[in-house]
UniProtKB/Swiss-Prot annotation:
Residues 147-166 are annotated as: Disordered. This is DNA damage up-regulated protein. It is found in: Nucleus; Chromosome. Induction: By DNA damage. Keywords: Chromosome, DNA damage, DNA repair, Nucleus, Phosphoprotein. The keyword Hydrolase does not apply. Phosphorylated in an ATR-dependent manner; phosphorylation is required for interaction with H2AX and RAD18 and for DDUP-mediated DNA damage repair. It comes from Homo sapiens. Treatment of cells with ATR inhibitor Berzosertib abolishes the interaction of DDUP with H2AX, RAD18 and RAD51C and inhibits formation of DDUP foci, leading to hypersensitivity of cancer cells to DNA-damaging chemotherapeutics. Interacts with DNA damage response proteins ATR, H2AX, PCNA, RAD18 and RAD51C. Forms a complex with H2AX and RAD18 following DDUP phosphorylation. GO terms for cellular component: chromosome; nucleus. Promotes DNA damage repair through both homologous recombination repair (HRR) and post-replication repair (PRR) mechanisms. Enhances the retention of DNA damage response protein RAD18 at sites of DNA damage. This allows for HRR via association of RAD18 with RAD51C and for PRR via RAD18-mediated promotion of PCNA monoubiquitination. One of its GO terms (biological process) is postreplication repair.
Length: 186
């Protein structure tokens, strides 16, 4: 399986997601992206472990390590993502940071943002882009395993009303329990 490494650190650096040719065995090469065979070389951006590497796949639905391209066995291009509570916490932090920015001014927003690591800030900015791309690609996401990297408090979040070709955010992400979110915000 070949993946595409997103070398940019902001949304414009992830333009590869918007330019991927999703036909099997074909891929467009665009600025900011390069093909890399797994395992990834040491020192790739965001690589604290293989699961945390920031990647985009040919279908644009694998931004976190742990996803698996299943095209060889099913004939379809979809991924089995392995999201962690940490990513969901980052998304929650972004929402709180934006709210506090409006309510408390720039200083309040900056204080909230400072509690995120650079990796978490990056994840919080791309979580909505991943949802958008998976929806556009019509990617059908298989069930997410109950156990995730942090070992507890996570559950698959599925939206029964959503169809495989129109995925809602709830059907894509593994959400944290209320206790973990409260802990993350404390």
């Amino acid at each position: 399986m070949w993946l595409v490494e997103c070398t940019g650190r902001d949304l414009t650096g992830l333009s590869c997601l918007l330019s991927m040719d999703r036909q099997p065995r074909r891929r467009q090469h665009v600025a900011g992206c390069r093909d890399v065979p797994p395992p990834l070389p040491q020192g790739s951006w965001g690589q604290t472990s293989p699961r945390h590497s920031i990647l985009c796949s040919k279908s644009g639905c694998d931004l976190l390590g742990g996803g698996e391209y299943n095209g060889e066995t099913s004939g379809e291009e979809f991924l089995a993502p392995a999201w962690t509570c940490r990513a969901q916490q980052a998304a929650t932090w972004l929402s709180v940071q934006q709210t506090s920015h409006k309510a408390l001014g720039p200083a309040g927003g900056a204080a909230m943002s400072s509690k995120l690591s650079p990796e978490e800030q990056f994840l919080s900015r791309i979580h909505f882009l991943r949802t958008f791309m998976c929806s556009v690609a019509g990617a059908e996401l298989p069930g997410i395993p109950q156990a995730t990297e942090n070992g507890e408090g996570c559950r698959p979040a599925r939206d029964p009303a959503s169809s495989p070709s129109s995925l809602s955010m709830a059907s894509v992400y593994t959400q944290c329990s209320s206790a973990q979110l409260v802990s993350a915000l404390s």
